[in-house]
Structure formats: C-alpha cells, structure tokens
Amino acid sequence: MHNYLTDLTDNQWQSIEKFFDCKRKRKYELSAIWDGILYVIKTGCQWRMLPKDFAPWQTVYYYFRQWKYAGIIEVILEEVVYKIRESVNKSPSPTVGIVDSQSAKTTAVGGFSIGYDAGKKVKGRKRHIVTDTLGNLLVVEVHSASYADRAKGFDVISLAKDKYKTIEKVFADGGYTGSLIDQVKQKLNCKLEIIKRTDKGFKVLPKRWIVERTLGWLSNDRRNSRDYEFSPLTSEAIIQLSFIKVALNKLFK
C-alpha cells in the first residue's frame, strides 16, 4: 500500500471512475494504476524506476498507453474542464480561448518532431496550448520547436474550435500576427485578437497571463521540465494528465 502526495483521493477517483471498466476483477486496481502514472509525471522518474509499492511498471505503462490511444485521457480532460466551469457558474463550453506556446528541450531519448527554436535557442519540441479564460487546458499540440507560432497557430486553434464550437474569439501574443488572423476568421469563423507589448519592462498583459500561468502549472511536474518522450503524442498525454491532476485538486480541495 502506498501513500504519496500524488495519489488521488477517494472523491477525486470517484469523479472519473465512470470512464473505466472497473467491474472486471483485476490483480491491480485501476485507481492504483492511475496513481502510478501521476507519480511518474510529478517526480519525473523513469517508468522502470517506479517504486515497488505500485503495480509493476510494465502494467502501469501498459494502461497509460491503452488510455492514451483510446482517447480516455482526452475525454477526462474535457470532463474536468466542464466541472470547473460549472463550479463557477460558467457555461460548459467556452466562447473565448487564449493560445500560447512553450519550447522544451528534448533529451538523448530522441524521437519524432524535434527541431531548433532560433528565438528561444532551444533544441526540442514546442507545446502549443489553448486555454479558456479560467486557465483550463482546452487542447494541446506538441510539435517541432522549429515551427514559428504563426505557422502552427492555426492547427491548435482549429483543434480548439473543433472541440469547443462555441469559441468566438482567441487571444494571442505578437507571434501570431500576419495572415493567420484572416485565416482564422475565414476558415474558422473566429476572431484572433493580438495583445502586443507596448513598452519595455515587466507588465501584466490582459489575458496573456492566464495561459502563461497554465504553462507554469504544467511545469511544476518534473516530467514536463523537459520533453522526455519519444513521441509527441505521449508528450500531449502527459500534459493532459498534468492538468487533470491540477483540475481535480481544484475541484476537491
């Protein structure tokens, strides 16, 4: 029996239990499997280094892969976003999004979609996210860091618009200027509003700080301190799980 800070409480697990087949008898409870995944994400340890009081690492990793490819993690993300919005009397589906990106170094593991971000001087991948005005993670796309924000901005905004069709406006920084504004308007029937820096020095910019705070939340998990994954899809699942834990902590304080 383990008792780590990353473990879900009974209330937290019960809120997402319906997404799993818990009726079939198993050697290891699915809640314990989930706890093992969260431990890896929080501590940044290798799967093979998972403490022995969890299920065998092979079992934990197997279920992580299954839930990733089955889309269960993504569905749970939508559920917790809905519940947080409902808890503050917001409509279930947002009308406003905020887009931003974060470049992360990759490791010797290598993998797909790795490039060089000349602006940040980072070799690795870029995490592109869209949040709502509460900072809830709506969508994430991980791709090579070599792509400029405006080059991949349409893709991630399109993902958000496809999942949350009520989105009418998206806020972004100056990296998303140019033809992207017209592209978003014409193809997605959505307004892209650019918030630019107007002076030097530190200044909290409207809306921008919200998405930057979310990126900060995600960075609290050591697995996100760099991109350790071979596949961008795995990186996306790790980020989704990181926010799910943040959301569950908010919902069940």
What are these regions (language model features)?
Residues 1-253:
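Short alpha-helical elements
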